């Protein structure tokens, strides 16, 4: 009986680690969805890049990546978000 419990525990642990591994590998930005937005505007000097969430997500969002690599979900209709997107699209002058 104890062998059956141990076997069940090992099987459960294996399945869980497989699931977590898949979630980690699949965490590129195109598969990231946002479930809440940041309430405060980011300082412009922190922003490095942006991307939109996938169409398969339940709500649209703009994900800004900071210079430190942090990803921040923002509402795409906020004026400051639209301004930052516009600034990031503009080619930089040398």
Swiss-Prot record:
Q: List this protein's GO terms for biological process.
A: antimicrobial humoral immune response mediated by antimicrobial peptide; cell-cell signaling; chemokine-mediated signaling pathway; chemotaxis; eosinophil chemotaxis; inflammatory response; monocyte chemotaxis; positive regulation of actin filament polymerization
Where is this protein localized, as stated in its record?
Secreted
Note the SS bond partners: 33-57, 34-73
Signal peptide extent:
1-23
Q: Which SUPFAM superfamilies match?
A: Interleukin 8-like chemokines
Taxonomically, the superkingdom here is Eukaryota
Q: Where are the transmembrane segments?
A: none
Coiled coil residues, start to end = none
Q: Which UniProt keywords apply?
A: Chemotaxis, Cytokine, Disulfide bond, Inflammatory response, Secreted, Signal
Q: Which CDD domains does the entry mention? A: Chemokine_CC
Q: Which is an annotated GO molecular function term of this record?
A: receptor ligand activity
Q: Does the keyword Kinase apply?
A: no
Principal place of residence: secreted
Reported tissue expression: Ubiquitously expressed at low levels in various tissues including heart and ovary.
State the family named in the UniProt similarity comment for this chain.
Belongs to the intercrine beta (chemokine CC) family.
What is this protein's function per UniProt?
Chemoattractant for eosinophils and basophils. Acts as a ligand for C-C chemokine receptor CCR3 which triggers Ca(2+) mobilization in eosinophils. Also acts as a ligand for CX3C chemokine receptor CX3CR1, inducing cell chemotaxis.
Q: What is this protein called?
A: C-C motif chemokine 26
